[in-house]
């Protein structure tokens, strides 16, 4: 999907993910995957837009406390280093919104998703909660959100949410 993006596919049948292999119609599953992969650019754009809408709305609703960030923090020796990287990726106006006001625009978030210096991973934490992180040059930038897009057998998104 996006540069450095890891994709995990899960198969659900009637809302259950513990499925008896004999119940699975492998041809139907393969057809669904083919449909999704045939329209890669469409899915990239659609999922990216949905993800940006969900994540950015959540991000901007939070009341971040400076300099102690609640769920947003920087693991680096210098905040200036992070600011320089952001200036290169999302330019001055959006960088100032993040650094000064903790406000993220959807367009800036999409640029972060597309940047080769950003990596998106899905981790399983010790307490078995899914977590989502964007890493920039091994510096953690956002944490604790994951985007789910659930597709049906027609290759359409049935539902999507952040957890």
Regions found by a protein language model. Give the residues of each.
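N-terminal domain-onset segments
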Residues: 1-129
């Amino acid at each position: 999907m996006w540069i450095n993006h890891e994709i995990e596919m899960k198969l659900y049948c009637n809302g259950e993910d513990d499925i008896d292999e004999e119940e699975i119609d492998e041809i139907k599953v393969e057809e669904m995957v083919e449909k999704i992969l045939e329209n890669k650019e469409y899915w990239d754009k659609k999922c990216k837009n949905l993800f940006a809408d969900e994540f950015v709305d959540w991000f901007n609703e939070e009341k971040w406390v400076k300099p102690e960030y609640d769920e947003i923090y920087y693991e680096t020796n210098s905040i200036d280093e992070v600011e320089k990287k952001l200036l290169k990726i999302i330019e001055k106006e959006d960088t100032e919104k993040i650094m000064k006001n903790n406000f993220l625009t959807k367009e800036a978030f999409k640029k972060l998703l597309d940047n080769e210096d950003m990596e998106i991973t899905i981790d399983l934490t010790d307490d078995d909660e899914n977590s989502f992180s964007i890493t920039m040059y091994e510096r953690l930038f956002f944490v604790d959100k994951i985007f789910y897009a659930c597709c049906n057998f027609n290759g359409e998104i049935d539902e999507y949410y952040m957890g």
